[in-house]
Amino acid sequence: MNNFEFKNPTKILFGEGQIENLSKEIPKNSKILMLYGGGSIKKNGIYDQVKEALSNYEVVEFGGIPANPEYSVLMKALKLIKNENIDCLLAVGGGSVIDGTKFLSAAALYKGDSPWNLLTDNKPITEGMPFATVLTLPATGSEMNSGAVITREETKEKLAMGGPGLFPVFSILDPQVIRSIPQRQLANGITDAFTHVLEQYMTYPTGALLQDRFAESILQTLVEVAPAILKDPADYNAASNFMWSCTMALNGLIQQGVPGDWAVHAMGHELTALYGIDHARTLAIVGPNHYRYNFESKKVKLAQYAERIWNIVEGTVEEKANIGIEKTEEFFHSLGINTKLSEYTDEYSETGSIVSKRFTDRGWTGLGEHKTLTPSDAEKIIEMSY
């Protein structure tokens, strides 16, 4: 096991009826900017619950944060923060709204020329305006981590940021919100969380037995509850386990002491930036072929994964590893997720070379757990995914 330091300061309020406890967690006299997305919270009752809980606070609202939080939209919210002297942010939404709020948390205190530099400078964010979240769509784990990804349509870019200053102060997770989530978004959430775990697990053995079992337990839980969630999102037990699995998949715990491989995310972000494909679906497009391309360096963990998640106990290491990849694709297909780029766009023929050039221009010359995956390798993986 590798050395590590681990701290996660986010408080979690989990369960039915927790939204009403907002007023117990936010300091009195706070002036709150409440941020949300396309307005679904006004249809499913969450908006009314939040407003009722905040009835004794001064609350300014900003809606319309899109599925991939757009820089130009967030800049309008930043202007509102400064004009209204906001001192507390509340994200009511899924990963996109929460990621956008994290950007605003950092941008509100930023002293530089352009807040976009927060994403291009590749420096950890050490301070931000206090913010909290009410999670409405389990998927990204953003409610309990310090990372965010922001899109800039003008330049077709999608870049990440993060640091110790971007943890939510607290997050409210009420599994009842899941009953109103459309099937497509539920499938995306399962796929997103599943891939998050794989990226922290599917590398090479380091003797981190507990971390492996943590990761495998999340994967097994997602496989187990996926059919129940898609059949009946109002199944509270299934919803609870789904929601908590998504949070645990990316709150920092399972990545401690082990190598990580975030190349799938890096490539997936480019597919979203170029074609607007749902984030989770880009991971399903790239992930299996990433494992095929890097088979030799990952086959031991792939075989372990096949044994422990899919009960593949017969065959050589190579045979089990290959079946593990096939089972992963089958799982995505069972959720209604297509795994070929050509199933999402007809304009895919130059995608590999475009992504390779972007990685080269950014200096991303060594991705993956060994820091050896080159832009040329990324090009080949994406071409395998056509």
Task: Indicate where each model-derived feature is located.
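A glycine/threonine-rich phosphate-anchoring loop and its flanking beta-alpha core
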Residues: 10, 20, 110-210, 304
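Active-site segments that bind and position negatively charged phosphate/pyrophosphate groups
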Residues: 200, 204-327
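C-terminal charged capping/lid subdomain of soluble metabolic enzymes
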Residues: 302, 309-386
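ATP/NTP phosphate-donor binding region
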Residues: 1-88, 341-342
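Short alpha-helical scaffolding segments that buttress acidic/His motifs in well-ordered protein cores
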Residues: 194-198, 239-250, 287, 328, ...
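Glycine/serine-rich anion-binding loops at beta->alpha junctions
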Residues: 86-102, 136-142, 274
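Short Gly/Thr/Asp-enriched flexible loops that form oxyanion-binding sites at enzyme active sites
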Residues: 78, 97-111, 144-145
